[in-house]
């Protein structure tokens, strides 16, 4: 049985990854501060990523899946081992982001495109770039995954959860402009499947965009969320002069990733309807796990008044 280390492990992406691979033929360890419930069937290594200390001395892992945010996260992890080679002796997989691509590049963004600061994502994107570059300088055979908007069960980010809440409360939905904003999504279990293929096979490409091949409009996304929640949808369009991040979970920014390389590893992705239906089933039982924003209060005070 191979040993796997997942950094984090207590919220959305890292938690889903840890539980997914714990059900497979892996002995899964998670590295976190132990301030939240741990993923099922995993073993905890309790440490703060900024101060790992001796928690990883004497340890070695065949596979590492790293959800770190910045160069220091990767550096702290690699230097916490007796040798960096022991940190993912077979595969080191870093979950990066589509935020590494400047908004000025031609779209769809290809993996070969030059990374740089994106004015929408700011430091989040540049921190991911620096983490990628440092990792490749230390472990050149590492794999880097660049997803768009991830969704699915365990998503604690107030995206589909916001729309589900509106649907459950039979609220009119306030849609930015005409709802034509294009969004690219990727289902969390599809991310797991791509990583599983990377682990099992000798994948030649080491930087891989992931995502659904087709984007969906904000309007269709909201319609689908209301449909899986079993609620009729009434929409009011909101003037573009009102900052949409005050009342909507996405920026007024369209982008698309080229996922040609991903299709070699995962020819078929989860349909949005089925994926959101699974998200809703999780949401109904775990509403307290979602990090809510004040969208509804803002709408009621500033828009619907």
Question: PLM features: residue spans?
Answer:
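Mid/C-terminal beta-alpha module of Rossmann-like enzyme folds, strongest
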Residues: 197-248, 253-254, 287, 293-304
